[in-house]
Structures are given as structure tokens and as C-alpha cells.
UniProtKB/Swiss-Prot annotation:
Naturally occurring in which organism (per UniProt): Sulfolobus acidocaldarius (strain ATCC 33909 / DSM 639 / JCM 8929 / NBRC 15157 / NCIMB 11770)
Gene name per UniProt: slaA
Stated family: Belongs to the Sulfolobales SlaA family.
UniProt subcellular location: Secreted, Cell wall, S-layer
Cysteine disulfide partners in this protein: none
NCBIfam families xrefs: S-lay_SlaA_Sulfolob
Domain of life: Archaea
InterPro entries registered for this protein in UniProt: S-layer_large
Modification after translation (UniProt): Glycosylated. C-terminal glycosylation sites are modified with a heterogeneous family of glycans, with the largest having a composition Glc(1)Man(2)GlcNAc(2) plus 6-sulfoquinovose (QuiS).
Protein name, per record: S-layer protein A
Quaternary organization: The mushroom-shaped unit cells of the Sulfolobales' S-layers may consist of three SlaB subunits and six SlaA subunits.
Length: 1424
């Protein structure tokens, strides 16, 4: 057969192939998804299933609009059109034993709508005890089938959302034939209520299927039917949810690409994969050890290659001379010669050779000499042959005779000795056959002798697996088996043997042909004598030759009865040459062939069947299946299961088909950003499904070769232990230092707790012949033979360019890199099992080049961690460096079938692309008034986490430093990434001046020699070129530099590019004042505490609040244009406040870099770091209007300061307290008593008092300054508020006028009550005593319309008021009820009067009250 076949030959797959006990089934492998308007059914099994016999019916309604308004109608319409056929069948014959078709009742059912998956669904409970009662089903469990339930609650038939769903009992459904609810006497319902008994006793299985009768809803058509669902059976592979066709869950996750749909109709499985199945076993409960038999076959005969492992013949059948040199097979076993003689010893000159064993026929003893022909003579065995059997004909039948060694306790293990010498040496062997001496000359060959045979044979193979499976929901057992287990696999086939004999009266000669082209000769067999000839053949394939063998030793007897009879008898013996034969591997039945002739001379021919059976070594079983053609795209596999506890064989078969897929390699899209920061890398995905070897621990497993039970046979198979690694890669690439991996003789596992958890067992581990190279720069997996000879080298080969790929250390064992596939995620039936994708993360960086770890310098290519490579290159080699990945499949089948097309090997190159770096000024023009012009270097490959710096040094060198860059524990290395080539200025007259890049010049030209990355990982760094420094170095002024061109040139080592930035230097206008506004300070005027004169006290000005701050507006359009996209600010550099008693100042000292504050006394109040004076902020980006204000405040205090009369120009003292302070960075700094700066303008006892202050302010834009004067004025503030007595009290009066308030309520004053009650408060805490001044006017002498008297008062009085500690809103005394004393008013005539009240600090003093200043009572009656 041609080895290379197509990826899928569907027509051949679907052929019915007889294997073992039943044909391959062609039913659905996996329940197909539900199409729009269709229906499907799923058996609810597995972990979390709440009961047995639950079937989920799903109708896809995605083709119509479903909303809250119509969901009830949609559910009822859909459910009313679902019909279910429930039946019972004989599991062996398929005959129907009962059937009923049911529908849902019009009410009383449980149905739901899933708004995410857009399906209507209903769960029916069919089996006891839930045939008549509902069972609750958690949404978390149902989400395995309907993932949308994880994110949204379903709606029930009433339209309400629910948190769980309930089943509809089978017994509540309506029999469509009667229109009535099915009765308990219904045979199907009766069977379902006793399903275990029915299955075990009557071989019954229960089957249900659904049909959606055709209907129209929302203008869309609905119809369809489900796959049959088997509820229970005696012991079968379930057809739901996984069907009898087994499948790998990775198939339905897109990993088969265009072949994904095969999972539903044609279950293809790649080699060495976990495949899923569900068994229904009503005989079992709890944990059951199952044995699975896998039968492999392909259509038609196969062409197989075999090689001669041994030639065994009686000495009379050997040529008199021939050349021979033993061939060493892949496992180290050597081919040998077997010479049968009657001599007790053979002689070779002076050398005497002892026999390896002997056998006896009819009393005559024959000696067997097993010899390897090599370079020396040895009396010590070089290898052994186990259980060599000779069949011989007798007069009536064929008899077997084992060849024994009487000197050995293991009498069937025959030693093989070596004879020989240098090439060309002739060995002459002498021995007898019967009584005739024979001499044979063997010349030692210069090349090994290997005889090959080719045969056309119809082959099949059988393998066994064992796994202990437990369940929480009998009778369903879900498990996983291996598609091609590493176990002893029996490969069998049928051929023929043909013989032609020439018979004479005294002797006969014959030729025997077997295995198509293997010919054995028998020369001159005398009558009544025996003659022997035979071969031992081994598979003629590099990886498995010498591991297993088939022995054919044929004995011939020439006899005379009534006819001349030439009889042949041959043994057919499977052998494992490196292992003792397994207990179940017995000699096959002998074959025989007889040639008869009534008279001689005569020539006769004959034919007889010949059997072939190889038992593979577990570690090479997969390779053997491939080499023999039994695993490939034409492979059909049937699987039977055996319940070892109940001794039951599955009634039906599971099945799957083989598939071999070539690998592919790809990268996720990437650009320069994949190579910048430490967490950036390129992901390379290698797709090689057939090579999945080592899944993650949660989905991996171990196999052990242990005795298994299958029917009445004891066989050996692979016992699967989930939870640990299957394969144990180790070893060193090459021909030496090979470590196969020691067998683990004892397993210790925890108790089984789930379907895939391990059990305790003891045995020997079989490792697949698949070991890993430990050189991470040339990471190979390779199939290596037992003697260390590599056969298939595969895996990932990596070549780094342009620098060599050296390891980070000189250690002899740097460790090897596992290519681990990803793990499948929930809701995969086997979460954690391997996917067919290997994800390899590749970092390429120059940033840690030259870093050291211990004593080792980091550079080149090395492994950072599992599945992660780092390629470290010099910065000058970074762009254009690449990693060339060559992936050779590690799967033998892929190599075998795709070798001729080369598809077994794929390539990918990951290269670092170039980028466009940029050196630029922010504007094509630069105002010369700026202190410096920004210069930006944008180089993406310089990008790194913050902070990252570039330092400029002598000659313009740029040193890159990124202290926070760490890649797998290795920090970045400071390195030179480029240099400034030149800085020049071309004047307006065309003259170009180049500035030498000396240390002094660099320090003058660059305000900061360190540029910081502006944003993490973006690679943009900001520098600044000093305009003043440029003027200094060129000895030019602003006018001379006007309209000149500044040029900077930089060379980048990483990209190899030379970058140039230019800007035109332009002289622009200075800043100018546009507007300014005065500040306002409020004072509270009162009188200094009583001084002994009741009618006079000195004025006391208490500073209370700054009600308005001084502000300025400047125009500086040129400054704004330096960065028109940003809102800029002008800085204040000096503020001097000049007042009545002196001046205070706040200024920035650019030399010291400090802000200095001095008060009105000339004292330094504070020295602050940096310029903390207020700034003027641009109103909008680029508009050039800047505005800002000074921030003054009043700091209250109790220190009363006397203001000299020389300052106030009065004849009396003036007092003040409260300090004027400036606010900087949120903190107030006192400049001195506010009254020493300014006082309100008031007239006090005929004298004018008052003064303003002036703030002299200097503003700078970094180039020029502007100074302006802004006044600060003072206002007198009167805090006392008066209000008439009212209930409830209203104080202060709401909405009262500032000056006068007339109260026209009736007031009566009697001689007994010469008082007037009012309420008094202060809007600021007022701690001093004050007077309520009362003036009384006759009503006829007061104009109430103007609020003014027309004559002098007829009475006045003063009433003292004081509250402790203070009067006022927010104090403990918010207001006072004051009785204004009017003693003596009764002396006035009775009549109508007007009383005017106001608050004064002392008698005759200024008014302290406001809102109103005067409280006027216009309706006062005085009685007598």
C-alpha cells in the first residue's frame, strides 16, 4: 500500500469492516448541534447529574423574535408540537418489545426559554423513581449543555425568570393513541419503572427520540427529529451524549479546522489521544475496573517489510561456504545463525563450540548451536533466545518439541555465543548430520548481513486498556481511553506456505516458500531421516526491528508408507527477543504440509496456511501500528468493553477512525510593540495534534503494563491512571549518555474520588520511546532505540540570526525545554486535557545584553522558562535580527505518511522589524524669549517602564538606563544607544556655526543632561536646549539670532538611522498688562475698651476678611504659541505690599532657588524651596490671555497694635488687630498687622481716618518680566443687627434695608414699663461692649416717609450691651433680648412718639449697626 494517503478517504471509512465480534457502526458519533427551527435531545449524564434517565429536549428558536410579551406563547406553541416516542428493545436482536408515542399536556408541564442560547427546552424524567414526580436540576449543571444559563436565568412557561428548572415526569405525558395520560399498566412505563431488572434479566434497553411536528411560528417553519437516546441497557456504549462513535473533545473546539464536522458524523481521532465514551452498565454500581479491547484494521492487504533475525537449519542444509556478519538491530539485538547437528560439539579448527540447547525426536538427540558472527570468539553468551520450539512430523501427526538447556535453571532461555574475527576471516565448522560429517566455511563479512522479505498480508491488531471508572449516577459510566495505548499489541495476519519436492527412491529435495519471497531449501533428505530449516523474522522497520519476532522452524521427514511421503511440520511462534514471552503469548498451532507420490521419481507441490503474530514492545506499539500500516487515514477501530466485576461484555461496539494531520506553525500578528517592554513577546503556535504527548497535570495520565481480565482470558494491557504524566522525556541528544528512564515498580495513589481520579495499584511503568533533547537551542524530541540509536529526530530546531545562539552559562546540563500544549478549559468533558497547540513565547531584546547572572553573562538565545525563549542581541544587531523556527513533527505517523511531501516539517521566522525613529522640535519656529526649546527623541525601541532615562555625555554620547526593566529576573544594562553627531546654527545671513560637543559646551547648552521617557514604553524622551546658553556660546544677542535655523543631528545605533531636527529661532514681543483689579479688606470698627470718658473711646479697627483679591490680566501671545495645544502659565517673581506703616515683600531668589517672605518690620518670615508665588494661567490653550490673582487672607489674633497718630494724622490714638497674610501653597504667611497697611476711610469724632495699600507685582514668562501696581482698599464693616421684639423672634431681620427699617407695630410705654424690647445680634463674633443709642421724637416732628426728623429729639438714652465671650451668629450667644432703658421718658407729655435706635461703640460714637443701621419705631404711645 502506498504510505502517503489523503487526509480523509470517506468512502473507505464508511465501509463495513469485520473485526473481532461485530462490524464497525456508522451511527452518529456526537449529537449534532441544533439548527434554527430544529430539535435535538441529550441524555444528562456525568458529574452533577441529579438523576438517571433525564433527557433534555432542545428546540432552536433563534429564527424568531422572542420577548417578554410573547415568551409564554412561544414556549406553549413549541412544547405542544413536541412528540416523544419511548420504546423498549432487545439489546441483542434489536427487536422492539414495547412502544408508546406521547405528547405534553396542555398544562402542568415544566418548560423554559433560554434567552442567551435562544432555545426552548424541556427535561423529561423517564426512569424510576422520577417517572411520576419531578426532579430539580441546577442551572450550573445544565450549563454544560446550554452555556447561556451561566449568564442569564431562563423564563418558565408563565414568563417568569427562575433560578432552577424541574423535569416533567414521563408518567404525566399524554398517549397520542388514546388522548389520555399514560397509565401505570403501560408496558413501556412499567419497564422504565423496573429498568435495572429489565436490562439484566431480559437484555432490554430503553430508547427515546423526539419529533417536532411541522408548524409555523412568527412566519418561520419548525420541524425535525432528534437522534435516538438510550436510557438504559444491559451493558453498552451509549449513543448519547457521545454516541457509540468515540471522540476527542478537542475535535469540537475547532482544532480539526475544516474537519470539525467529522465529530458529528465520522469520528476521526489522532494518534495517542484521549477519547471519550459513556458506558451504560446496569449490572454495575460504584467503582468498576473496565477492560477495553481495541481492534485495528484497514481495508485490503498490506505490504509489510520483514528482516531476517536468525537463520536456523540443520547442518546438511547449509551451503558449504558463505559470507556472514551479524546485523545489530535498533534495540541492540544481533542477528544470528542456528546450526542443528547430531554432534555434541562443533569444531572450528582448534576452537570447540558447545551447543546452546538440544531436543530429542524418537530417541535421537539433536543439538542446536546459536551463533553470532562478529569480530571475536566468546564463550560468554552475548544474547539469549527464549522458548525456541521445533515442530516435527511423525507418522500420524505433528509434535512440538521445546529446545532446552539442561545446564540452566531457565531451561528455555538459550544462550547465543559469538564466533568470528576480522573481516575476511574464514571459520570452518565441522559437525555430523546423522552419521555423515559436514563442513561449512563461514567468511566474516565486512558489512552486516541483512536479508529482507516483503509480504502481502491482511493484518489486524488488538490492544487492551484498563481503567477503573466510578460514577455518582448509575448506570452511566463516563471515561476516557487512549486511541493508541503504549501496551503490548497483538498484530496478526494470514499468509500461505508453498512447497515443491523432488522425490526419488532413496532421498528427496525440496524448496519451501513463505512470506512471499522467503525460500528455504532441503537437500537430499534420506528416507526415514529428518531435515530442518527455518527463519526468525522481525519487522523490517528501523524503530522496531529486533524488538519483536516471529519464528518459523520447519522440520521435514521423508518416509515410505504406501506412498512416498515428504512431510513438513512448522512452528509458528511469536517472540519478544528482549523480554520473556508474556504468559498469554503461546506458540500458535503448528502448520503442516504433505507431498505424496505413489511412485518415484516425482515432483510434487502443495500449499498450506501460514499465520503471523507480532507482540509489540509497549514503548514501540504506536510505531509498530504505523509501520505495519494499521494506523493511518484508512484505519478503522472498534472498541468493546468488559465489566471485570460482573464478567459482562458490552453488547455493542464503540468505534472511531484514525487520522493523521501534518503540523503547522503560525505567529499572532505582531509589530514593533511586541519587542519593547518586558511583558511583550511574540506568540508562536505550533499545531501538531498527533504529537500531543504531555498535557497539563489536571488532564494527564500514566500507563502501566499489568495483567487484565477480558472474558475468560488473562491478557496484558495499558492500565491508565489519570492525574500524572504519561511520558517521561529525558536523555541527551546524540548517541551517548542515553537514559531511558528507570521503571517505577510501585504506584501509590490516593483513593478514587471521581471518574478520572486514580486508584491504588502496583506495577511497572512503560515509557513511550520518546525522549527530549536537553539542549534548548536545538530542542528536539526524538524516537530513540533501546541501544541509543536515534531513529526519528523531531521537535523544534531554532537558529538565531544575525548573532550566534549561545547559552547564558557554561554549565554542562542547562536543562531542556518542554513543549507543553495548552489545557482544555471547562466545559470540555475532560478539562485540563491537552489541546493540539503548543504556544511558544519569544522575547527578542537588547536591553539585558551583557547582564550577568552569577558569573554568567547573558547574551544569545536561551530558555527563560517553560515554553519561553529569550533572544538577547547587541543593540546594533537588534533590528533585522530573527529567530528561525523549524518544527519537525514528533509524531511517527506524520513523519511516515508525509515524509515524501515534506509536510512533516514546517518553518517560521520571527524578525524584528525596523521602525521610524524621529528627532524633532515641537514647533518649526521657536520664540527666542524662551529659556529653552524642547527637543524630543522618539525611538520606539528605546521604550521601557518608567522611569527610563537617556543621559547625554561628552561628544554627544547617549547612555540609556532603565532601572525598572526586569526580564525573568535579569535587569536591564546601561548602554550607549546612539550619539549626537552635531549641533549647528545657520544665521539669517547664511553663515553656519557648528558648536563643538565638549563637556563644558554640553552643560551650557542643555539645562538638563538627562532626558526622561515621557510615557511608559513609548520611547519618547524630552531634552531642552537652552536659548540663553546658545546665546552665550555663540556670543550673540536675541536680535542677532532672529530668523536663524537651529539644527541637531543624532545617530541611532538600534535602527542605524541618522535623525535631524530643525527649528527657526524667532524674536517675539514681550508680555504686556491688559487689566488689573484692586483688592478689598473689610475692617470691623469699634471702640477701644473704655478709657474713663463715657462719651469717647479711641477707634479700634479689627481686620476681618479679604473680600476681594487683587488680580491682573496679561497678554503674551508669543509665549502662548510656544505650545498652543496646552494651557500655559506666567510666574510671579516679586510681590511688594506698601502700606501706611511700611512695606512687606515676597520674592523668588533665582540664585538660591528659594522664595523669601519678609514682613512689614523687615523680618524674614519664611524661606521656601522653589518659586511658590502665584501664577497667571492662560484662559484657553493658545489664546495668549493670562489671568490670576494674589491670595491674601486675614489671620485673626488678640494682639492689639496702636497705630501712631503721626501715621493717621489724628489727635487721638488708633488701635488695630488682625494680621494681613499672603497664602502660598495653601499656607498663610503673616506680613504684619493689617492696620499698618491700610485702614477704612471713616470720620471719627470729626477727624478723617483711612489709607489704602499698594501691591507692586512683577510677572515673568521665563524670558521677560513686567511690573505693575495694584491697589488694596479697606472697607468699614458694621456687624451689629437690630430687630424688634417679635414672637417668634426674627433676628437678623430678613431682607432688611441697609440703613433704615421702620416698624409700625403698636408700642405702649407706661410709667411702670419705661423700656423698649429689641433683639440684638452680630454677624461676626463681637466680644466688646457697645451701646444702644435711643433718640425720641414727637411723631409730628418726624417724617416717616423719609425716615428723618424735622426737629431735635425730645429725649435720648444709652443702654450698654455685652455678651461673653462674644455675641454673634455661630457663638454660644447667637442673639440677646435687650431692654432699652428709657428712664425719664415718662416726664414727656402723653401722646404719639417715634423712637430711633442704633448701635454705637460709645455715647456719640459712630454707628455699628447695619441692615438696618437705624431701627425706627413709628407707632409708640406714651401714657401717664
Amino acid at each position: 500500500m502506498n504510505k502517503l494517503v489523503g487526509l480523509l478517504v470517506s468512502s473507505l471509512f464508511l465501509a463495513s469492516i469485520l473485526i473481532g465480534i461485530a462490524p464497525a457502526i456508522t451511527t452518529t458519533a456526537l449529537t449534532p448541534p441544533v439548527s434554527a427551527g430544529g430539535i435535538q435531545a441529550y441524555l444528562l449524564t456525568g458529574s452533577g447529574a441529579p438523576a438517571s434517565g433525564l433527557v433534555l429536549f432542545v428546540v432552536n428558536v433563534s429564527n424568531i423574535q422572542v420577548s417578554s410579551s410573547n415568551v409564554t406563547n412561544v414556549i406553549s406553541t413549541v412544547v405542544s408540537n413536541i412528540q416523544i416516542n419511548a420504546k423498549t428493545e432487545n439489546a441483542q436482536t434489536g427487536a422492539t418489545t414495547g412502544s408508546v408515542t406521547v405528547r405534553f399536556p396542555t398544562s402542568g408541564y415544566n418548560a423554559y426559554y433560554d434567552s442567551v442560547d435562544k432555545v426552548v427546552f424541556v427535561v423529561v424524567s423517564f426512569l424510576y423513581p422520577y417517572t411520576t414526580t419531578s426532579v430539580n436540576i441546577p442551572l450550573s449543571y445544565l450549563s454544560k449543555y446550554l452555556p447561556g444559563l451561566l449568564t442569564a436565568q431562563p423564563y418558565d412557561e408563565t414568563g417568569a425568570q427562575v433560578t432552577s428548572v424541574s423535569s416533567t415526569p414521563f408518567g404525566s405525558l399524554i398517549d397520542t393513541s388514546t388522548g389520555q395520560q399514560i397509565l401505570g399498566t403501560n408496558p413501556v412505563l412499567t419497564s422504565y419503572n423496573s429498568y435495572t431488572t429489565q436490562a439484566n434479566t431480559n437484555m432490554q434497553e430503553g430508547v427515546v427520540s423526539g419529533t417536532l411536528t411541522s408548524f409555523t411560528l412568527g412566519g418561520q417553519s419548525f420541524s425535525g427529529s432528534t437522534v435516538p437516546v438510550i436510557l438504559y441497557a444491559p451493558f453498552i456504549f451509549s449513543n448519547s451524549p457521545y454516541q457509540a462513535g468515540l471522540y476527542n473533545p478537542m475535535q469540537v473546539n475547532g482544532n480539526l479546522g475544516s474537519l470539525s464536522s467529522e465529530a458529528y458524523y465520522h469520528p476521526v481521532i489522532w494518534g495517542r489521544a484521549l477519547i471519550n465514551t459513556t458506558l451504560i452498565d446496569t449490572y454495575a454500581s460504584g467503582s468498576v475496573p473496565f477492560t477495553f479491547q481495541l481492534n485495528y484494521s484497514v481495508p485490503g492487504p498490506l505490504t509489510i517489510n520483514m528482516a531476517q533475525l536468525a537463520w536456523i537449519a540443520s547442518i546438511n542444509n547449509l551451503p558449504t561456504s558463505f559470507t556472514y556478519l551479524s546485523y545489530k538491530f535498533s534495540n541492540g539485538y544481533e542477528s544470528f545463525l542456528g546450526i542443528i547437528s547430531n554432534s555434541t560439539q562443533l569444531t572450528a579448527g582448534a576452537l570447540t563450540i558447545n551447543p546452546s540447547g538440544n531436543f530429542t525426536i524418537n530417541g535421537k538427540k539433536f543439538y542446536v548451536y546459536l551463533l553470532v558472527v562478529g569480530s571475536t570468539n566468546s564463550t560468554t553468551p552475548v544474547e539469549y533466545v527464549t522458548k525456541l520450539v521445533v515442530e516435527y512430523p511423525s507418522s500420524t501427526n505433528f509434535l512440538p518439541q521445546g529446545v532446552t538447556v539442561t545446564t540452566s535453571s531457565n531451561k528455555y532461555t538459550l544462550p547465543v555465543y559469538e564466533i568470528g574475527g576480522p573481516a575476511g576471516t574464514t571459520i570452518t565448522l565441522t559437525g555430523n548430520w546423522y552419521s555423515t560429517p559436514y563442513t561449512v566455511q563461514i567468511t566474516v563479512g565486512s558489512t552486516p548481513t541483512l536479508t529482507n522479505y516483503v509480504s502481502q498480508i491482511l493484518l489486524k491488531a488488538v490492544a487492551y486498556e484498563g481503567i477503573n471508572v466510578s460514577t455518582t449516577q448509575s448506570p452511566y459510566y463516563s471515561t476516557a481511553i487512549l486511541s493508541t495505548p503504549p501496551s503490548e499489541i497483538s498484530i496478526t495476519g494470514s499468509s500461505t506456505i508453498t512447497a515443491q519436492g523432488k522425490l526419488t527412491a532413496t532421498s528427496a529435495s525440496a524448496t519451501v516458500n513463505l512470506l512471499t519471497n522467503a525460500t528455504l531449501t532441503y537437500e537430499n533428505i534420506p528416507l526415514t531421516q529428518y531435515s530442518f530449516n527455518g527463519i526468525i523474522v522481525t519487522p523490517g522497520y528501523a524503530a522496531i526491528n529486533g524488538t519483536t519476532a516471529m519464528a518459523y522452524v520447519i522440520g521435514a521427514l521423508y518416509n515410505k508408507t504406501s506412498d512416498y511421503v515428504l512431510s513438513f511440520a512448522g512452528s509458528q511462534e511469536p517472540m519478544q527477543v528482549m523480554n520473556n514471552n508474556l504468559t498469554e503469548v503461546t506458540t500458535l498451532a503448528p502448520f503442516g504440509l504433505t507431498l505424496l507420490a505413489p511412485s518415484v521419481p516425482a515432483t510434487e507441490t502443495g500449499t498450506s496456511p501460514l499465520q503471523l503474530e507480532f507482540f509489540t514492545v509497549p514503548s514501540t506499539s504506536y510505531i509498530a501500528l504505523v509501520d505495519f500500516g494499521l494506523w493511518g487515514n484508512l484505519t478503522s477501530v472498534t472498541v468493546s468493553a468488559y465489566d471485570t466485576v460482573n464478567n459482562k461484555l458490552s453488547v455493542n461496539l464503540g468505534y472511531f477512525y484514525g487520522i493523521v494531520i501534518p503540523p503547522s506553525i503560525s505567529t499572532a500578528p505582531y509589530n514593533y510593540q511586541n519587542f519593547i517592554c518586558p511583558n511583550n513577546y511574540v506568540t508562536v503556535t505550533i499545531y501538531d495534534p498527533d504529537a500531543v504527548l504531555d498535557p497539563y497535570p489536571s488532564g494527564s495520565f500514566t500507563t502501566s503494563s499489568l495483567p487484565l481480565k477480558y472474558g475468560n482470558m488473562n491478557i496484558t494491557g495499558a492500565v491508565i491512571f489519570p492525574g500524572s504524566s504519561v511520558y517521561n522525556p529525558s536523555g541527551v541528544f546524540g548517541y551517548s549518555n542515553f537514559n531511558k528512564g528507570a521503571a517505577v515498580t510501585t504506584f501509590t495513589y490516593t483513593a478514587q474520588s471521581g471518574p478520572f481520579s486514580p486508584v491504588a495499584l502496583t506495577g511497572n511503568t512503560n515509557y513511550l520511546s520518546q525522549y527530549a533533547d536537553n539542549n534548548p537551542t536545538d530542542n528536539y524530541y526524538f524516537i530513540q532505540t533501546v541501544n541509543g540509536m536515534p531513529v526519528l529526530m523531531g521537535g523544534l530546531s531554532i537558529v538565531a540570526s544575525p548573532v550566534s545562539a549561545s547559552l547564558p552559562s557554561s554549565t554542562s546540563s542547562p536543562g531542556f525545554m518542554y513543549l507543553l500544549p495548552s489545557a482544555a478549559q471547562v466545559p470540555s468533558p475532560l478539562p485540563g486535557m491537552a489541546t493540539p497547540n503548543y504556544n511558544l513565547n519569544i522575547y527578542i531584546t537588547y536591553k539585558i545584553d551583557g547582564a550577568t547572572v552569577g558569573n554568567n553573562m547573558i547574551n544569545g538565545l536561551y530558555v527563560a522558562s517553560q515554553n519561553t525563549l529569550i533572544y538577547v542581541v547587541p543593540n546594533g544587531s537588534f533590528v533585522g535580527s530573527n529567530i528561525k523556527l523549524t518544527y519537525t513533527t514528533t509524531d511517527y505517523a506524520v513523519l511516515h505518511y508525509f515524509y515524501s511531501t515534506g509536510q512533516y516539517k514546517v518553518f517560521k521566522t520571527v524578525s524584528v522589524p525596523n521602525v521610524t525613529a524621529n528627532l524633532y522640535f515641537p514647533s518649526s519656529t521657536t520664540p527666542l524669549y524662551q529659556l529653552s526649546v524642547p527637543l524630543y527623541l522618539s525611538e520606539p525601541y528605546y521604550g521601557s517602564p518608567l522611569p527610563t532615562y537617556i543621559g547625554l555625555g561628552t561628544n554627544g554620547t547617549s547612555l540609556w538606563n532603565s532601572p525598572n526593566y526586569v526580564l525573568f529576573g535579569v535587569s536591564a544594562v546601561q548602554q550607549y544607544l546612539g550619539f549626537i553627531k552635531s549641533i549647528s546654527v545657520t544665521l539669517s545671513n547664511g553663515t553656519t556655526v557648528v558648536i563643538p560637543l565638549t563637556t563644558s559646551n554640553m552643560q551650557t547648552l542643555f539645562p538638563q543632561l538627562v532626558g526622561q521617557e515621557l510615557q511608559a514604553c513609548n520611547g519618547t524622551f524630552q531634552f531642552g536646549i537652552s536659548i540663553t546658553g546658545l546665546e552665550k556660546l555663540l556670543n550673540l544677542n536675541v536680535q542677532q539670532l532672529n530668523n536663524s535655523i537651529l539644527s541637531v543631528t543624532y545617530h541611532d545605533y538600534v535602527t542605524g538611522e541618522t535623525l535631524t531636527a530643525t527649528t527657526k529661532l524667532v524674536a517675539l514681543s514681550t508680555l504686556s498688562l491688559v487689566a488689573k483689579g484692586a483688592g478689598v479688606v473689610e475692617f470691623l470698627l469699634t471702640a477701644y475698651p473704655y478709657t474713663g470718658n463715657i462719651t469717647f473711646a479711641p477707634p479700634w479697627f479689627i481686620a476681618e476678611n479679604v473680600v476681594k483679591q487683587p488680580f491682573m490680566t496679561y497678554s503674551d501671545l508669543q509665549f502662548a504659541k510656544t505650545n498652543p495645544s496646552a494651557i500655559l502659565s506666567l510666574s510671579t517673581v516679586n510681590i511688594t505690599v506698601v502700606g501706611l506703616g511700611g512695606k512687606a515683600s515676597v520674592y523668588y531668589n533665582s540664585t538660591s532657588g528659594q522664595t523669601v517672605i519678609t514682613n512689614i518690620y523687615g523680618q524674614t518670615v519664611a524661606t521656601l524651596s522653589g518659586n511658590v508665588l502665584p501664577t497667571l494661567t492662560e484662559l484657553a490653550a493658545g489664546n495668549g490671555t493670562f489671568t490670576g490673582s494674589l491670595q491674601f487672607t486675614i489671620v485673626p489674633n488678640n494682639t492689639v497694635v496702636q497705630i501712631p497718630s503721626s501715621l493717621t494724622k489724628t489727635s487721638f490714638a488708633v488701635y488695630t488687630n488682625g494680621s494681613l497674610a499672603i497664602v502660598l501653597n495653601g499656607k498663610a504667611y503673616s506680613l504684619g498687622p493689617a492696620g499698618l497697611f491700610l485702614l477704612p476711610f471713616v470720620t471719627y469724632t470729626g477727624s478723617a481716618i483711612g489709607a489704602n495699600a499698594t501691591a507692586i507685582i512683577t510677572v515673568s514668562d521665563g524670558v521677560g518680566t513686567s511690573t505693575t501696581q495694584v491697589p488694596i482698599t479697606a472697607e468699614n464693616f458694621t456687624p451689629i443687627r437690630l430687630a424688634p421684639f417679635q414672637v417668634p423672634a426674627q433676628v437678623p431681620l430678613p431682607n432688611a434695608p441697609k440703613l433704615k427699617y421702620e416698624y409700625n407695630g403698636s408700642i405702649v410705654i407706661t410709667p411702670q414699663q419705661q423700656v423698649l424690647k429689641i433683639y440684638v445680634t452680630s454677624i461676626l463674633p463681637y466680644p466688646q461692649e457697645f451701646q444702644i443709642q435711643a433718640f425720641v421724637y414727637e411723631a409730628s416732628q418726624f417724617n416717616v416717609h423719609t425716615g428723618s426728623p424735622t426737629a431735635a429729639p425730645v429725649y435720648f438714652s444709652y443702654s450698654a450691651v455685652r455678651a461673653y465671650p462674644a455675641l454673634g451668629i455661630g457663638t454660644s450667644v447667637p442673639n440677646l433680648l435687650v431692654y432699652v432703658q428709657l428712664q425719664g421718658i415718662s416726664n414727656l407729655p402723653a401722646g404719639k412718639y417715634v423712637i430711633v435706635l442704633s448701635a454705637v461703640p460709645f455715647a456719640g460714637g459712630p454707628v455699628l449697626s447695619e441692615y438696618p443701621a437705624q431701627l425706627i419705631f413709628t407707632n409708640v404711645t406714651l401714657t401717664q
